[in-house]
């Protein structure tokens, strides 16, 4: 395989195939700084229950819609809400919570992508605030998934 770089592109050549991709402009996220061990809220939740709930929510949104799933964590409960032109959903899941209550929004597809590849029965989410990334990781740190939150209007809640 051959690799070629220009100022704005990268070119991959292998066998009789050539691929071209545009390079990202600007600075990329500094992942090391984002992977903090500090958190305000730690949540343990049944992975299958959370995944099924988010999966059901995606039935209410079209691919072109950028509707976030709103997650409200209070006491021993996680409320998941989504409202779209098709309908709305509001579900509750029992959780183990350590730390502060939080209200945060995520692109449901990104959350589903992370949860689908985790083999554990229970997952642990670490949250700092509604504008900081969420981490899903196990105790041994054999995996870490970073999911960026999305902004949402208070009218969506």
Residues of each region from the PLM?
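DNA polymerase processivity clamps
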Residues: 1-24, 39-157
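Short hinge/gating elements
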Residues: 34-38
């Amino acid at each position: 395989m051959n690799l070629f770089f220009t100022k704005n592109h990268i070119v991959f050549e292998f066998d009789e195939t050539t691929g071209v991709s545009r390079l990202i402009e600007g600075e990329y996220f500094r992942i090391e700084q984002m992977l903090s061990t500090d958190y305000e809220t730690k949540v343990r939740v049944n992975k299958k229950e959370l995944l099924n709930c988010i999966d059901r929510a995606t039935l209410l949104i079209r691919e072109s819609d950028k509707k976030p799933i709103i997650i409200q964590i209070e006491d021993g409960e996680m409320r998941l809400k989504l409202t779209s032109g098709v309908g709305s959903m509001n579900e509750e899941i029992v959780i183990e919570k350590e730390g502060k209550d939080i209200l945060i929004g995520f692109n449901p597809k990104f959350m589903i992508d992370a949860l689908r590849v985790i083999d554990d029965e229970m997952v642990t989410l670490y949250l700092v605030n509604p504008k900081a990334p969420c981490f899903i990781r196990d105790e041994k740190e054999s995996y870490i998934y970073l999911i960026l939150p999305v902004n949402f209007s208070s009218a969506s809640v």
